[in-house]
Amino acid sequence: MATAKKSTAKKSAAKKPATTARAAKTDATVLLQRDHADVKKLFKQYEKLADAEADGEERQALASQICAMLTVHATIEEEIFYPAAREAEVDDDLLDEAEVEHASAKDLIAQIQSMSPDDELYDANVIVLGEYIDHHVQEEEGEMFPKCRRAKMDLAELATALAQRKAELMAEV
């Protein structure tokens, strides 16, 4: 009988969303860095498609995936991570800049979503968005995250909250 209980417990543990389970073993900055790496790969894929003058539907599908991923990522940072960083008195100027960068990215995302992949500047908008995001990521990972690690933030607890909210938002996409 004890064996049956163990296998049932393992099955229910396996049903946890992977991001939530992973978050329990990491900290918030690592979770956010994973998102950064994932979206960077998608931008590289997009550039290859654009260079190869790939089918518009294929480019649009990838651009939509990028936009959705970035929208969810920005939301969890704005709702959870940035307020926690402000509370821990991490550099307010750096956080202000990050929020302005998010606003610029959201504007480009809205432009991309309103365009057709056949529009003259479609590829340019997606590529420029990638460049904006690359700059934003460099500042977060190079300046903000180290300051957050030194501040009195519960990064493990934040990772769990970020992963849960991300799962909720991804379910809506």
Where are the predicted features?
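Small-residue-biased structural context
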Residues: 2-173
